[in-house]
């Protein structure tokens, strides 16, 4: 039997929290646009935009922000105020600035594995966003 020499990790929500920040931001987005559409419908429209845009923007915060802006324009009939677009950009900036907090035991586990294995990060996320987390 061959000895395992390399271990790959999917980082987001495996090594550190990630999805919870997207969900919290989505709640704030829904509140920003509450006057235009029911929260559940707005969430569904945002999800449609995210899926439609994956091939164009990929995974990550920047693609999420662009999908939120696109959704805001769509649900407002093009009348979304510039200040609301600014608020959406602010939500994205907050996500990008949020400190990375590893999940319990991750640091110790990686340090131990690094002594005997090559460790690699496997991600579908935005390169710049993922690199800032390392």
Regions found by a protein language model. Give the residues of each.
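Active-site neighborhood of HAD-like aspartate-dependent phosphohydrolases
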Residues: 1-45
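An amphipathic alpha-helix signature
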Residues: 22-30, 65, 69, 127, ...
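A metal-dependent, Asp-based hydrolase signature
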Residues: 35, 48-94
């Amino acid at each position: 039997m061959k000895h395992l020499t390399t271990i790959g990790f999917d980082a987001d929500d495996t090594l550190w929290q990630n999805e919870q920040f997207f969900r919290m931001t989505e709640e704030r987005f829904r509140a920003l646009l509450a006057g235009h559409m029911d929260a559940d419908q707005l969430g569904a429209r945002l999800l449609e935009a995210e899926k439609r845009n994956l091939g164009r923007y990929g995974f990550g915060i920047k693609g999420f922000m662009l999908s939120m802006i696109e959704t805001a324009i769509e649900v407002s009939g093009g009348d979304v105020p510039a200040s609301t677009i600014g608020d959406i950009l602010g939500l994205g900036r907050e996500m990008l600035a949020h400190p990375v907090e590893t999940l319990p035991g991750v640091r110790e586990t990686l340090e131990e594995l690094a002594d005997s294995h090559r460790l690699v990060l496997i991600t579908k996320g935005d390169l710049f966003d993922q690199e800032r987390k390392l």
